[in-house]
């Protein structure tokens, strides 16, 4: 899989940082990609001594990365708010993928400030891979959550995440679970909530199921079953609930999904599904934005 050529790892002291680095090294080696390992120190932590110690630590780390087979390795010590400095680095150096580890649950911190991972998924212009600790590598089971529509922009993001998930499944020889959660919409939603016969209700549900199945089959037509061990799921219901059920039932290792639910206010929202999954699931998550996404973070 030669998709990524310029990878950034946001490295910190959290549990799971080593796991994120290990996965980034593996992908960089497979892609012959440049790898940048960055530590972001908050301004209150960035004493000259702390910066010097961090630089020396990164130098030692880079030798290990090179020994693992990555020839182009850069290290950086940045100062400021972690997610802001990481995104600014992405803009400056045109990174095409960011690795970060999930932070330990801290409800108050996330309520008032938001986690670094959540901010990256919301606002980073390139794909973001959030690694949760102790995930097995290579992955055995990958879930891609799609929502095929008629809209060109939505078709585009579905194709992006399908391409990426299929490439990863092929690389790791993993089972690829493809899920599209659907529900009744429009006037039919009012109809099934009203007093109609069982036969009428079932006819409405069948019509919507078939419509979504057709859209999903059209999307999957470009991904031959002979090349992938794939399982297709078409549950009715809210996407975040369907994803959670499937993650637990199938013991999914990685979720690949889009992170922008609506186009309109760049960067200041995240699709409800992606944010819910990011905060609740214990597997790693790779999120992708549509082409043309504009980050609200300035490069300086």
Which residues fall in each region the model found?
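Structural beta-alpha unit
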Residues: 1-3, 16, 23, 45, ...
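Small/aliphatic-rich secondary-structure junction motif
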Residues: 1-50, 141-199, 280, 290-295
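General small-molecule cofactor/ligand-binding pocket signal
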Residues: 36-38, 74-78, 129, 177-179, ...
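A short acidic, glycine-rich active-site loop
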Residues: 49-50, 198-212
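Short beta-strand elements of ligand-binding domains
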Residues: 99-102, 127-133, 286-289
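Glycine-rich, Arg-bearing micro-motifs that act as flexible, cationic patches
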Residues: 101-119, 254-279
